[in-house]
Amino acid sequence: MIAMNRTVDLDASYTFCRQIARSRARNFYYSFLLLSRDQRNAMCAIYAFMRYCDDISEAEGASGSALERWSQDLDRALSGQYPDNPLWPAFHDTVQRYKIPCHYFHEMIDGVSGDLVPRRIQTFDELYRYCYRVASVVGLTIIHIFGFESPDALELAEKCGIAFQLTNILRDVREDSANGRVYIPAEDIAHFGADLAEHDDRFVALLSFEAQRALDYYDQSRPLLSLVAPRSRPSLWALIEIYRRLLSRIQRSNYDVLARRIRVPTWEKLAILARATFS
C-alpha cells in the first residue's frame, strides 16, 4: 500500500485516468470534452474505477475473491490509504471534491459481481435491479460532478441510467449470449416465442418491445437536463443524444444485432458535440 499525497502524484493519477477514458470510453468520453477541466478529470477518474470493475469481473477465471479484494482496496482508498494502483489518488480526490456518496461504488461492485457466472434474467423487475446497480448508480454518481440542487434529479438520473443500460443490452445480445449471459427477461422471450440466436419476426418483435421500454425511460428522464447546473447541460445532452442515436440505429437496422455490433460513428458523435457546443 502506498500513500500518494503530493501534487505531482495526484496529477499523474489524473493523467492515468484520462488515458483509460480516452482509450476505452467510446461514448462517455466525447461528452466529457464539453465540461470544465476539473469536471472532465473527475469524470475520467470515475470512469477508470468503473472500467476496472468491469475488467475484473470479465477477466478469464474471474472470481468473487478478486472483486472482494477490489472492494477492500476501495475502502482503503476512500480512507486515504492508496493501494498500489495509480487510479486511486484521483478517484479519492474526486469523491471528496464532489461529495459523492461512497455507497454508490460498492453498489457498482455488487452489480458486476453478478456477471462472474452465467446468468439468465427471469423478469423485468430482476433486470431493473441489475440495471440500477451497473448503470443507474453511475448516473447518480456523475450528477454530483455535473452539479444539481433539486432532489428530483436523483430519481431522474436513475431512470436515465436504466435507459442507457437497456440500450447497451440490445446492442450486445450476441456478445452476452456467447458469454452465457441473457439479460432480456425470460418472461419476455417466452411471450414472443423468440430465439435469441435467430433473427426472425419474433426476434424483431421482442427487441422492438425492449427498445420501447428504453425509449420510455429516456422520455421519463428528460427533465433531468434542466435540473443539472447550466454549465453541465451541453455535456449531459450530448451523452443522452449519443445513446439515443445508438438506440435509433439499432431500430433502423431492424434489430440486426446478431450480424454485427452497431455503433454511432465518430463523425456523428463529433456532430453531436458541435451541436451541443453552439446550440
What are these regions (language model features)?
Residues 1-166, 170, 174-279:
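Catalytic cores of Mg2+-dependent Asp-rich isoprenoid enzymes
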